[in-house]
Amino acid sequence: SRNDEVATCIRIALRDELLELMIEVNYLRRALIEKAGENVDTLIPGYTHLQHAQATTFAHQYMAHADALARDFSRLLNAYEHTNLCPLGAAAFASTGFPIDRAKTTKLLGFNSMLENSMDAVSSRDFIIESISCFSNLMTNLSRLAEEIILWSTSEFDFIRVPSEYVTGSSIMPQKRNPDYAELIRARAGTVCGCLMSVLSICKALPYSYNRDLQEVTPHLFKATEYTTASVLVMTGMVKGLELKKDKLEKQTQIGFISATELADTIVRSTDIPFRTAHKIVSRLAEEGKDRAEDEEEAESDVVLRRIDELAMKSIGKKLSEIGLTERKVKEALNIASNIRKRDVKGGPAKREVLRMIDRRKTDLDKDGRSRQVKEERVKRSLDELAREVKKKKRVIKVMKT
């Protein structure tokens, strides 16, 4: 029946696309990890609400993107397992009275297993929903990276230079370097999510078994697959060619009182006062000084300590310099590089910890690559066996005809 044949062909096509997409995702992961490895000492401002928050490193931030993509790879791997199931032999939906061997066709076509219930086999499209859901998640992660590239390449941020092959000019403005490719990735994330919503809406409330509505599902699948694979490929090239403006990045870590959290932490560690109290003191200090100090590390630590003492007297009735806080500790708290070194807990931005993560992620990446390759080779062996079976049958038919 066309019902089980079409379902089988869609699954074969999709499993091939999933295997190809997994390769591209791993290329992008490797590009991010390598770019991080080149910049473990590159200081950058970290943001919350797009406001200066705490200092981190470029490597730490790009490893965050790589980790998100590692989860995307895992989801694609799971989607492959649910896709690579064989519906062939289900016929229209009630199977057949002929003595077919469904297990044999399942094996020869490279499927992991068969969809046993013949009605489920022809009417289910949940594997498509799952796959496009994975694509949507992946594209959402790519859109965050794309948005970052777009922002960081603006004149206002000016942190990076996007490779020339991924920007376009203007028909009338000679100076323009528009990050069009990143913008298209950002936009296509919405398109892929739209494909998911369309397929969910089509499949909702469909009665068993087959309905022609399902014909409308496949175009959304192919569009989502094409957009996702192309976006990953383009992003890989863009990441590889990014040029960092390290001086500008580091300069941005010196403004906006980005060391405020570490100063509050230092006060707590040195004096044992409650963090809420330290937070209140440093918050007041930030309100007074954030517009005056263009370079935090140039601020005189003795001046900062005196002002902290004044604020502490108003808040708790004692000077913090009398209960453990020193000028040296204040100076160290205001030092951005020192801030980073202290954050050496698991997953933190300290160099030693980031290098450990990079090493571990490379190992994970190699392992994931092997997992994908095993699946691809299994399919190839099955199809080779199928080709041999067909060749053998042809010889038998030829002999019988003679």
Regions found by a protein language model. Name each.
Residues 42, 46, 79-85, 152-156, ...:
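Flexible, glycine/charged-enriched surface loops at secondary-structure junctions
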